[in-house]
Amino acid sequence: MYKLEKAQAKQVVGGLSFWTFSAGLIMIVNALTGVAHAVNDIFQSTTANANGSDDDNENKNNSYRSKSNYFNTARFKLGLTPGSSSYSFPVFS
């Protein structure tokens, strides 16, 4: 069996740790971006309803209470159902 020399072993470990760190950093940035978008969606939909906009054309894009576009909002993707304060994951079958 081929045995690595010490310098080669250090190079392999260094390369692996670099790629692991890079992948982890990308995953963290991606997760934070997703959370930021979700919070933004929830904030926009909440303010659209709080402003008392009853016109369908006015709050069609931001209202999480309308049944037509509720499934595209971050509240559904995060499992936050209307009228429920508990956190639940949506079940897909």
UniProtKB/Swiss-Prot annotation:
This is Uncharacterized protein MG220. NCBIfam families: MPN313. GO terms for cellular component: plasma membrane. The keyword Chloroplast does not apply. It is a single-pass membrane protein. The keyword Metal-binding does not apply. Residues 47-66 are annotated as: Disordered. It is found in: Cell membrane. The chain crosses the membrane at residues 12-32. It comes from the Bacteria. Disruption phenotype: Not essential, it can be deleted. Coiled coil: none annotated. Keywords: Cell membrane, Membrane, Transmembrane, Transmembrane helix.
